[in-house]
Amino acid sequence: LNKIASNEISFGVGLTEYIAAREDAGIEIDGSKASGRALFVIDGDHASHFVLADKNGVMCIVRAEDAEVELVKLTSVDKTRGYFEIVLNNADVDVLENSSQSAEAITKTVDAGRIMLAADSVGASQVMIDKSVEYAKERKQFGRVIGSFQAVKHMCAEMAAELEPCYAIVWHAAHCFNNVPEEARLMACQSKSHVSEVSKMVAKKATEVHGGMGFTDLLGLHYWFK
């Protein structure tokens, strides 16, 4: 943990084989060795290590620099993080002992990921709202800034009103994760589900406020939405 905190090492995460196993992919762990393929491993661009899981929820750590570990970058519309396919050919792994004894370790890891993605979406939505408000203050039409028109005001107000409760939802989900274990999974799922829906609405409204410019790469709204 100290090395992670000091940025000496960094991790990519690939748990999709446990969440939604595929017939043409998967990891087989045999003692301290593992073979197979893990798809949609996130944050692999600068990772020195990867946390991977098999279909049973057993997690292991592999080193990106090992010769038996092959990284294949995947093409994605999401430019905020790198997605990879990790191919293991009898690679050395460190199995997380707790994960082989109980499903609690993989469950908590997945729930933590849900909460972090929800928080990520809240931040992206706030950026889109801020950009929309600033644009509405500057863009002029019919001799007036468009922010003075009631329809534009309504869109900005609706985005802000829908997003504000999401801060509390994410905060409560994070609180439950450590302090209310019986509600942790429900709140993790609820926060990710609700914030995702609100974020889609914010992206749509933000694009409407920007008009045709909202569809261009110049303003970058699509970056935050994706």
Regions found by a protein language model. Give the residues of each.
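FAD-binding core of flavoproteins
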Residues: 2-130
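Alpha-helical interface subdomain recognition
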Residues: 7-8, 33, 95, 99, ...
